[in-house]
Curated annotation (Swiss-Prot):
Protein family according to the UniProt entry: Belongs to the universal ribosomal protein uL3 family.
Gene Ontology molecular function terms on file: rRNA binding; structural constituent of ribosome
Subunit structure: Part of the 50S ribosomal subunit. Forms a cluster with proteins L14 and L24e.
A GO CC term attached to the entry: cytosolic large ribosomal subunit
Classification of source organism: Archaea, Thermoproteota, Thermoprotei, Thermoproteales, Thermoproteaceae
Name of the gene encoding the protein in the UniProt record: rpl3
Annotated spans, Disordered: 230-256, 315-338
Listed InterPro entries: L3_arc_euk (IPR045077), Ribosomal_L3_dom_3_arc_sf (IPR044892), Ribosomal_uL3 (IPR000597), Ribosomal_uL3_arc (IPR019928), Ribosomal_uL3_CS (IPR019926), Transl_B-barrel_sf (IPR009000)
Keyword rRNA-binding among record annotations: yes
Family annotation (PANTHER family): 60S RIBOSOMAL PROTEIN L3-RELATED, LARGE RIBOSOMAL SUBUNIT PROTEIN UL3
Functional note: One of the primary rRNA binding proteins, it binds directly near the 3'-end of the 23S rRNA, where it nucleates assembly of the 50S subunit.
Organism listed in the record: Pyrobaculum arsenaticum (strain DSM 13514 / JCM 11321 / PZ6)
Identification of the protein by name: Large ribosomal subunit protein uL3
HAMAP family reported for this sequence: Ribosomal_uL3_A (MF_01325_A)
Length: 338
């Protein structure tokens, strides 16, 4: 019996196929059913500006550093308000159980930047659309707000907005959700209307693209010695598998790396600010610029490059031992250099 060699499989089939995301705007496949006691949007969208480090008072009672100042890496998100330009009612298809759009209502007055991504009608007949809502009110199972980002209020320097659908939840009664959606038509929603400091959020974004990469960078294959044991190359595998099957998923292969949609769960939201000048460094964020309005501080790193759209949502699977939901005390941020 020969020596048993431990050779774990390379990569995860959970993220197969490793190809470029279909859209740079992340697609949220799951929305949690949370009980907030009042109707509210279940998510928000912001732009990644950069990272800093902050001094925060540790408020976890079981931590050895409880009550002491600790240094945390934080990500800064530029969070201009979202514009609600409509909402949709969804019913269940009796044949397959899927959601089907039943009614749609647009706001009477739409911003001019929305014409860059939508063909705007000359006049919106809101009364006619509201009759459809009343027709499907009894069979509706979900209400989703149609929102548009406002990048002209951010530090990116572009005008074309991104469009998203964000469900309205927080209460089980569908009539309360519809009433809340009607009240939001033509208005803006700030991050404080959706989240509160101290809570956990899930982050969905498209990662930074790396292009076509080899097996060493993509899967961490060992580089062979440069002067022997490398008959046909030292930055490659010895074999890519047998003749049949044609493709071995356990074998590292070169290909696309990065620009994949990824979800990171249970990131703690440290702070929601209104004045971006208090968080922006003197020379601005590198490769981003200046934050002009509301911003969000999240503990840890987030996927994606600077200027990339990041979608935040209420946690889909919060931990059993969640940190305190009270607002953390942020003592100092590294952008406040003398």
């Amino acid at each position: 019996m020969g020596l048993k060699i431990n050779r774990p499989r390379r990569g995860s089939m959970g993220v197969y196929p490793r190809k470029r995301a279909a859209d740079i705007v992340p697609r949220v496949r799951t929305w949690p059913d949370v009980n907030l006691g009042k109707p509210a949007l279940l998510g928000f969208a912001a732009y990644k500006a950069g990272m800093l480090h902050a001094v925060v008072v540790d408020d976890r009672p079981t931590s050895p550093l409880y009550g002491k100042e600790v240094v945390k890496a934080v990500t800064v998100l530029d969070a201009p308000p979202l514009f609600v330009w409509g909402f949709r009612l969804y019913t269940l298809d009796p044949t397959n159980g899927y959601l089907r759009s039943a009614a749609e209502v647009w706001a009477g007055e739409l911003p001019k930047h929305l014409s860059r991504v939508l063909t705007l009608p000359e006049k919106v007949d809101v009364d006619k659309q509201m009759k459809q809502v009343e027709e499907y009110r009894d069979v509706a199972v979900e209400v989703r707000a149609l929102v548009a980002t406002q990048p002209h209020l951010s530090g990116i320097g572009k005008k074309t907005p991104e469009l998203l659908e964000i469900p309205i939840g927080g209460v089980p009664n569908i009539d309360e959700r519809i009433k809340f959606a009607i009240s939001l038509l033509g208005k803006t929603v700030s991050p404080k209307d959706v989240f509160s400091p101290g809570q956990l959020v899930d982050v969905i974004a498209v990662t930074k693209g790396k292009g076509w990469q080899g097996v060493v960078k993509r899967f961490g294959v060992t580089i062979l010695p440069r002067w022997h044991k490398h008959r046909k190359g030292h930055r490659r595998t010895g074999t890519i598998g047998p003749q049949a099957p044609a493709l071995m998923f356990t074998q590292p292969r070169p290909g696309q790396m990065g620009f994949h949609q990824r979800t990171e769960y249970n990131k703690r939201l440290l702070k929601i600010g209104e004045n971006g000048a208090e968080i922006t460094p003197k020379s601005g964020f590198p490769h981003y610029g200046v934050i002009k309005g509301p911003y969000i501080l999240i503990q840890g790193s987030l996927p994606g490059a600077r200027k990339r759209l990041v979608v935040l949502r209420h946690p889909a699977r919060p931990p059993r031992r969640a940190p305190p939901t009270t607002e953390p005390q942020v003592v100092w941020v590294s952008s406040q250099q003398p």
